[in-house]
Amino acid sequence: DEKILLFPSWETGGTHLRSPLARAVWRRHRQFTAAFEDAWLRSGRFEAAFPGELQDVSAGEWRRVVYDSPADYPAVHPQHERRKYLLFQQNAPGPSRLVSFAGFGEYGRSKLRRAQHLTAAGFTPEPEMLAHGFLRRRFVAGSPVGPGEVTAELLETVAAYLAHLYREHAAEPSVSSDTLREMIATNLEEGLGQSWSKDLLDLPSGEWIERGVMLDGRMLAHEWIRSATGYMKVDALDHHDDHFFPGCQDIAWDLAAAAVELNLGNHGRDVLVEHYRSISGDRGIAQRLPFYRIAYLSFRLGYTSLASATLGDSPDARRFVVETRRYIELIERELGSRLVGHRHG
C-alpha cells in the first residue's frame, strides 16, 4: 500500500465515492494534488495568457450571471462542468470574453476547429485563440431559453443546426443500437423500480443508426441563448467525445433531445422534424425518432437519478429530483398505458 500514490485532480477524502471498497481503500493512500488556483491563477501564468479581470463561472456559477433568481436556475452537476472564466477587459462595460478549458494538444485543437466551423455556419460564438488548453471565445450577451419560450425562429435555428451537424460532422458511431437497447433496459428497470418488466417495452431489433454524427449532445433549453442577432448555441464542442452516452451517434438522438428539452407538443415536434428534413434531406428521420426518444429519455432518467443521489442535500440535488420526475412522466406517456398500469396496478 505504501508504494501506491494517488494523483487526483482535486483533493478529497473519498467519502462521495459510490463503491464502499473504493471509499475504504482511498483513505489508505497518500494523495498529491496541485491546485489550479496556485499553479495558474496566483502565479500569474493565466493572466499573462488572458489579460484582464477574471470571474470564475465554473461549477454552475455562470447561472448567477444570466439569471435573476436561483428559482430560475437549471439543474447542474458541478463536477461535470469544465473550468471556465468570464474575462472583463479594460474599458469594457461587461464581460467581453469567455475562457473555458478545451483540452491539451489535439484534444484542444479539435475543439478549436469545431468551434471555427460552427461559427462560420452561424451557430456558435466566435473562437479567438487556444492557449494552455483554454479556448477564448467572444461572450454573447443574451438570455437562455426558458420553459414556454419556444418561437418559430428558434425551431428553425435548431433544425438548421442539426441539419448542419448531419451533413458536415459525420463520424463512426461510438456505440451500437444493441448497446443503446441495453442502456434503455437497465435505466428503466433501475429508475422505475423492480416492478418494471422488459417484456413491456417492445423495442425494435436491428440497427437504428443511419449515419454516425459528432453530436451536440447537450440540447437542453438553456444551452440556447437568445441574443440581439438571433439564437446562438453554447456548449456545443465536445459532448460527442466525453464520458457520457451516446458519443458519436445518429442525429436522431439530438433531434429527440431537442423535442424533449424544448417541451414540444406533437405539433411543435412535427414542425421541427419537417424543418430539419427539408434542410438535411434525411428522409428516414421520422422512422428513427421513436427509438431515439426512448433512448434519450432513458439516459436522462439515469443521469438525473444518479446526480440527485450524489449531490446530497443541495439545491441542485432537489432540481435533479424534479427533472427525474419529469422524465418518468414523459416515459410513461411514451410507452402508454401498459407501463402505467403495470406500475400502479
Give short role names for the model-derived ranges:
Residues 2-14, 24-35, 126-135, 244, ...:
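A generic structural motif
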Residues 2-5, 19-33, 93-94, 118-126, ...:
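Structural alpha-beta junctions
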Residues 6-12, 16-19, 23, 27, ...:
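Helix-rich C-terminal or lid/interface subdomains of diverse kinases
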Residues 25-70, 191-193:
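Juxta-kinase regulatory segment immediately upstream of eukaryotic protein kinase catalytic domains
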Residues 62-201, 221-223, 228-230, 234-298:
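Conserved ATP-binding subdomain of kinase catalytic cores across diverse folds
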Residues 201-203, 208:
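Pre-Walker A segment
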Residues 211-221:
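Catalytic-loop of the protein kinase fold
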Residues 339-345:
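Long, compositionally biased intrinsically disordered regions
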